Regions:
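Conserved AAA+ ATPase "SRH/arginine-finger" region at the nucleotide-binding site
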Residues: 158-171
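Structural recognition of the conserved hydrophobic beta-strand(s) that form the central parallel beta-sheet
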Residues: 68-69, 103-105, 133-139
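Sensor-1/coupling segment of RecA-like P-loop NTPase cores
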Residues: 122-149
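Pre-Walker A (pre-P-loop) alpha-helix and adjacent loop at the N terminus of AAA/AAA+ ATPase modules
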Residues: 2-35
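Conserved AAA+ ATPase "sensor/coupling" helix adjacent to the nucleotide-binding pocket
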Residues: 158, 173-185
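Short regulatory helix/loop adjacent to the ATP-binding pocket of P-loop NTPases
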Residues: 81-84, 142-157
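Walker A/P-loop nucleotide-binding motif
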Residues: 28-51
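Short glycine-rich substrate-engagement loop in P-loop NTPases that contacts/grips substrate
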Residues: 58, 63-101
């Protein structure tokens, strides 16, 4: 289970960690910490932080409705809903619109999919107007996503947090967390050199 307690943090990711924790703590406070954008290369802990927010809210604030989806799940849901709307003309994506906190991982994967980008802009705009909360993760900063300027502006309006490459010492701490502590000293130093991008 991904939690804030088992997330290994240091100088490279402390801003993202503390911002995610603050976001979870203030999720029921309208107009505060409305959006959070966490970015960095794959494998550096972004998904862990997003799921930590989700799990923290589920445990401590179950009354807050949360939707977590990676970009592929969002795309699949949107296509399914578009097909359903053709048959029933009913409102779509209620599982997204009806929540208090929306968490989307790997948003870069919707680049180039015009209908999906346009709909996500509408969705995010609605959340911001209604003082709901949005958390986004991507592999690069908003300015480097080459997305619609309106959506980039929405991303930039919130808190931006970089998760940087871990140092040698940081990798060692991560390996200590996931190895048997009694064997960590010998095993971790042996493997740390091969964990770039962990």
């Amino acid at each position: 289970k991904f939690t804030f307690e088992n997330f290994v943090f240091g100088p490279e990711n402390s801003l993202a960690y503390r911002s995610a924790l603050k976001f979870a703590m203030l999720a029921d406070t309208p107009g505060t910490c409305t959006s959070l954008f966490i970015y960095g290369k794959s494998g550096l802990g972004k998904t862990h932080l997003l799921l930590a927010i989700k799990n923290e809210l589920a445990e401590k604030s179950p009354e807050i409705k949360v939707k977590y989806a990676n970009s592929q799940a969002y795309l699949d849901d949107l296509m399914t809903e578009f097909d359903r709307q053709k048959k029933s003309n009913a409102p779509i994506m209620q599982a997204y619109h009806g929540v208090d906190v929306l968490i989307i991982d790997d948003i870069q994967n919707i680049i180039g999919k015009r209908a999906s980008v346009d709909y996500f802009f509408q969705l995010m705009d609605e959340f911001i107007r209604n003082n709901k909360k949005v958390v986004i993760a991507a592999d690069r900063a908003p300015k480097d996503l080459n997305m619609d300027e309106r959506l980039t502006s929405r991303f930039n309006a919130g808190l931006l947090c970089l998760v940087a490459e871990p140092s040698y010492e940081m990798k060692y701490k991560i390996l200590q967390r996931y190895y048997d502590p009694r064997q960590a000293t010998t095993r971790c130093w042996r493997h740390t050199g091969a964990t770039a991008g962990i």
